[in-house]
Amino acid sequence: MAIRPGEASGRASGRTALETIGLGKRYGRRWALRDCTFRLPAGRICALAGPPGAGTSTLLSLASGLLRPTEGTVRVCGESGPAGRARVAHVTQGKPLYPRLTVAETLRLGRELNPGRWNDRCAEQIVRDGGLSLGARAGVLPEGQRTVLAFALAFAREPELLLLDDPLDGLDPLDRHRIAALLLARSAERATTVVLSSQALAELDGICDYLLVLGGGRVRLAGEADDVVGMHTLVMGERRGEGLPREIAAHTVIDTQLSGRHFTALVRRKGPLAPGPWEAAEPSLEELLLGYLRAPGAPGLIAPSAEPVSSRRPHRPGGRPGIPGMPRNGRPGTAGVPGGTPHTSYHHHSGKGAAA
């Protein structure tokens, strides 16, 4: 994927925007997030995905300081505690706003609550470009304009890390397109790192260049989007027995979809895929995410780009630095996910990668 304008300096410096080590949050006896370890380099737009209850909202709240961790650490731009939280803006689910305040009053309140860290020009331009009336009350704004106002409050703080919890939820296709364009343009201006949680997987493909997938409160998949997608192949063909052909089963099979006599399999390659009576293609970002979401027992993957620097073991002759138990360079591993088998579902459909 192309590097956004203004992003190159953040990438070249190797800076880290968000890093967690063994992060966990427990409510009573239930762990909402457990053993969460990853690194997000600066300047990325990261897709955060997971099924309901996966821990995505919990992770964002821990990163912004809304929640305290039960265990582990979280650092923003190398800082923990108040110093790290000062670098974050967080748009939570539902985009809560004071309904009786006008747009102008909402922006004024934002300025008063963020002394010394507020860009009036940025806030006003976002509101103006979004077609909002300064006299309109926040409580009567349509959903798309509520999102624009929430983004104005967030970007006006000039955060280094912007956390967005399902901001596209409830928007019509036109509003989603407008909000995505706003996000890309504004984050590019200051090379703001963005973590975007969304259930609209198709929308993430043209926005995000980094992936983080949670499942069961644990990290399932993390790394540069191009690298992670490139490690996988979508294979489609006709079944000639009960299972997959052995040439395909020899790789790490993440997810298999069966329709009549045909199969579609998402595999993480261990090497070159042998030729055969099947078609092979690189999966789209949506197909990759769907495969991992449908297969909670399949081996996870933490790419080298997502390994926290502070937890890497010293290099030893004959070995590679990394995190114990996590795969390196695309090799199979559990990445903290209990062992299990790849997911297979039976349904009637035509077309590759359809959801079960």
Segments from the language model and where they lie:
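Catalytic Walker B motif of ABC-type/P-loop ATPase nucleotide-binding domains
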Residues: L162-D166
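Conserved ABC transporter NBD signature motif
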Residues: E71-G84
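ABC transporter nucleotide-binding domain
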Residues: H177-V267
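The feature captures the beta-strand-to-loop junction immediately N-terminal to the Walker
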Residues: A49-P51
